[in-house]
Amino acid sequence: MWKHLLSGGLKVEQQNASAKKLILSVLNSTATKREARDYLTKYTRSDDSKQLNHCLLLIRHLNSLRQHEISELTSTVKKLGMLGLRPIFVIPPSRHIAKQAEILDIITTLAGFRPLQLQNSLSQSIDGTYTSILSSQNAILNNHELEVVPILKPYVYREKDASEFLTNDFTKFMQNLCKGNNTHIDKFFILNRIGGIPSNERNENSHVFVNLSQEYDCLKKDLKGQVDLLIERRPRTESLLHKLELHLNEDAINTLENQFKEHLQDLEMMNVVLSNLSSSATGLITTIESAASSSEKKNPLIYNILTDRSLISSSLPRFKKIRHTPPSGSRPAKKFHRMTYLEDYQQLDKSSPPDSALVTTVFKKGIDIKIFDYPKLTQFNSLSLPVEFRVKDSPQTNPLHKIDLSKLKGLIDRSFKRSLNLNHYLHRINGNIASIIVIGDYDGIAILTNEGPNDNPFVYLDKFAISPEMKGSLCISDIIFNLMVKKFPKELLWRSRNDNVVNKWYFQRSVGVLDLSIDLGDGNQTKSNFNLFYYGEPKSTNYGFHNLARLKEYAKHIRDIHPSWDK
């Protein structure tokens, strides 16, 4: 499928048949055409290109690696080079720096590179400012012929007294290391024994994707709270039994405390590093075991280089099982699909290693998100509003942000390749808007409205649009979908034409699908080429496909919505 894209010649650090075979293998099984083109544009170079692409690679607990893990990690590092990405190793501060440097030296050499151990990664001038070795040694690091891979030790050289010291603030060290350097770093990988940032929503498995600009503060607060709770060592009650319980579990609590401290530091480092790299840079935290996987389809590092995303989508429901039974009291119909939640990626064999998708978190610096909860659009909360929708009464307070209807319409027109009749559209939705979500500079939007009976409305996703040039990048679709289901967890509905190429994506994220041409009873049937999709609480008897009367309300109101396109 991708051979024609490679026909112009692939120039990477180790150009050979193995490299092409590796790339074709992964692209054929995982990547879209857009992702393949993006990869080839970013990581293949012409003969006169002076830029080398690098990844920062931090491996924790190196001194505990077993021989087979060293061998498998060596294979992964070699593949990084084949794919056009040269590693820069960073050693975390510990008592085992010399041993860890020795192991990295072996890995680098066996992977076909020339290791270069660098003692003082930072220099502190007399005025207290820092200079990164990534800047001062840029000419060597970017030399194509030398094939040098630096191994950076966590020491700082202090000009004031011509001394060196081991950093006592690794997060600050990483921040200064990446600040203002000329070395092109596109990825930051952290490998450890505990995996990515834990998520309560995923049964303590790792977050799949983190948009740092949106989620960092909340995640840091949660992790800090867990650390403080473990440090406090408070028994459940003051009874002797519970105090004894605490004492007997001291070792386990210590282990858990250290793990959460590590998670917290990993998150903080990811934030400061990505803040100093380009907006397109990606971070990833996973286990050493996953990163050492020989399967390119399951190795999160290899997969991310080729697709710039996580192994699974972050907006997929965690639990889903398909059933083909209609609700009680209705006639069987092939056009009805109902689903209930079942543990997705369920770990049946607890002794086997966890799936890489469960222990990997992908990070982006993130993009701006604005959520407008204006039921009605007026000239006071929007720009480019048609005159007929202006109101006389001014609000008591003016909103800080306004919806730009010109940009909103432009995005919808480009995304759907049709022209939206804004006046017709506003006549239908104005006054019934549940929320409008805007990503970046109108790179993505979701318009949600209140539909159905006045006394019992439901939330309907009326428009979901992503800028064509941004599709597949920055996980915008996943970000919007996650925001919607968190904001409206009980009921969220939308419709899509039967031949829409996005229907597979919709189907995977819904818990119910209904063909809107179905007979709703009493002769209530209309020809329709739309499917209805439902997301909501699976155990609720008041909402969703468990309630036949409510299901009919969904179907009738959504089926009968008239589109607002120019003819």
Curated annotation (Swiss-Prot):
Q: Where in the cell is it found?
A: Mitochondrion
Q: Which gene encodes it?
A: ARG2
Supply the source organism for this entry: Vanderwaltozyma polyspora (strain ATCC 22028 / DSM 70294 / BCRC 21397 / CBS 2163 / NBRC 10782 / NRRL Y-8283 / UCD 57-17) (Kluyveromyces polysporus)
Lineage, please? Answer: Eukaryota, Fungi, Dikarya, Ascomycota, Saccharomycotina
Q: What catalytic reaction does the record list?
A: L-glutamate + acetyl-CoA = N-acetyl-L-glutamate + CoA + H(+)
**InterPro entries associated with the record:** GlcNAc_Synth_fun (IPR011190), Vertebrate-like_GNAT_dom (IPR006855)
Q: In the UniProt record, does the keyword Mitochondrion occur?
A: yes
The alphabetized list of GO BP terms reads: L-arginine biosynthetic process; ornithine biosynthetic process
Q: Chief subcellular site?
A: mitochondrion
Name recorded for this polypeptide: Amino-acid acetyltransferase, mitochondrial
For this UniProt record, the keywords arranged alphabetically read as follows:
Acyltransferase, Amino-acid biosynthesis, Mitochondrion, Transferase, Transit peptide
What pathway, per the record?
Amino-acid biosynthesis; L-arginine biosynthesis; N(2)-acetyl-L-ornithine from L-glutamate: step 1/4
Q: What is its EC number?
A: 2.3.1.1
Instruction: Give the record's GO CC terms.
Output: NAGS/NAGK complex
